[in-house]
A protein has these predicted regions:
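Carbohydrate-binding surfaces of carbohydrate-active enzymes
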Residues: 1-54, 59-278
């Protein structure tokens, strides 16, 4: 069964790879919200590998829906993919909401934007900016699920400072190399979407973390001076293994090699392999 699921996952990732290949032939880039938030049968990190601009999403504050941070910030997949695959621009569908409507303002939205920046998002796409023809009645035709930001918003003419603040943060955060403490291996990545909803406990304790997949462990990771390093300059202090009894032989062999090279590994000891070996 594992091999069947892995095949399905690989075929989905191949779809994203081919889409990117076709786009590049025409001088275009791809931006894919390939991380959900809904469950699918694929390694979403691998799908984001083939997105030039990985994309997540986060929701505005509300007392009626998606109340907790884990429900609101669906960003860690896209951020992790950006880090492990060397993509400096990491975007998000931003301030999504199904209410309150026409009540949000910059003062209300700023803490949410700041949290998204701290999570690793550095490019915002307002969800939504309704394009309403000038002849329609104000505030215009809108999509039901969004924080409505457009020229018909009452505070639009006073929003220069707010937009400048967002723009400056995005520019600065797209520079340099991210500093991340821990990488968490999520196994095959199939049927693991729950792990991607923001694990606020780690961040609230002051630790940054990325998720990594088998592809990155096998093809990109090395150990230098006790740190787990990637070719793009990002390094981690330790690798955390998933709470699973089985890991593929290929990944186990690479992890053993990393331990011999001085890497720190934390997690339960695997007791079996998964799938057919080679």
């Amino acid at each position: 069964m594992n091999d069947y699921k892995q095949t399905v996952s690989d075929l989905i990732a191949e779809h994203y790879r081919y889409q990117q290949e076709v786009a590049h032939k025409d001088g275009l880039l791809t931006m894919c919200e390939a991380s959900g938030p809904h469950q699918n049968q694929s390694d979403a990190l691998l799908c984001q590998k083939y997105s030039d601009v990985p994309m997540g999403e986060f929701w505005a504050r509300s007392k009626t829906h998606r109340i907790s941070l884990k429900q609101r910030f669906l960003t860690k997949e896209a951020v992790s993919a950006g880090h492990i695959y060397g993509k400096n621009v990491i975007s998000a569908e931003s301030f999504t909401s199904v209410g309150p409507q026409w009540e949000e303002d910059p003062y209300f939205l700023k803490p949410t934007a700041d949290r998204a920046f701290c999570e690793g998002i550095n490019k915002l796409y307002f969800h939504t900016y309704p394009h309403s023809p000038s002849l329609t009645a104000k505030p215009g035709f809108v999509y039901y699920a969004g924080t409505y930001i457009n020229r018909n918003t009452t505070w639009w003419n006073y929003s220069l400072d707010w937009n400048t603040y967002l723009a400056r943060n995005q520019y600065v955060l797209q520079q340099g190399t991210p500093v991340v403490d821990v990488c968490i291996y999520y196994g095959t990545g199939i049927e693991k979407r729950i792990q991607y909803k923001q694990d606020s406990a780690l961040m609230d304790l002051g630790y940054q973390y990325d998720y990594v997949n088998s592809d990155v462990i096998l093809n990109q990771m090395s150990v230098q001076d006790g740190k787990i390093c990637l070719p793009n300059g990002i390094s981690y202090e330790l690798l955390v293994l998933p709470e699973e009894s089985g890991i593929s032989i290929e990944v186990l062999e690479k992890i053993r090699e990393m331990v011999y090279d001085g890497a720190t590994i934390v997690g339960p000891r695997p007791i079996c392999s998964i799938g057919l070996y080679k």
